[in-house]
Curated annotation (Swiss-Prot):
Its cofactor is Ca(2+). Snake venom phospholipase A2 (PLA2) that shows myotoxic activities. PLA2 catalyzes the calcium-dependent hydrolysis of the 2-acyl groups in 3-sn-phosphoglycerides. It is found in: Secreted. Binds 1 Ca(2+) ion. Belongs to the phospholipase A2 family. Group II subfamily. Contains 7 disulfide bonds. GO terms for cellular component: extracellular region. Keywords: Calcium, Disulfide bond, Hydrolase, Lipid degradation, Lipid metabolism, Metal-binding, Myotoxin, Secreted, Toxin. This is Basic phospholipase A2 Smb-N6. Negative results: does not show neurotoxic activities. Disulfide bonds: none annotated. It is an enzyme of class 3 (hydrolase).
Length: 23
């Protein structure tokens, strides 16, 4: 699910795991 993936990315971004992923 793209929405679940987007949520996961946002959580990872908060943990600074993907600072280049701003979506």
């Amino acid at each position: 699910n793209l929405l679940q993936f987007n949520k996961m990315i946002k959580i990872m971004t908060k943990k600074n795991a993907f600072p280049f992923y701003t979506s």
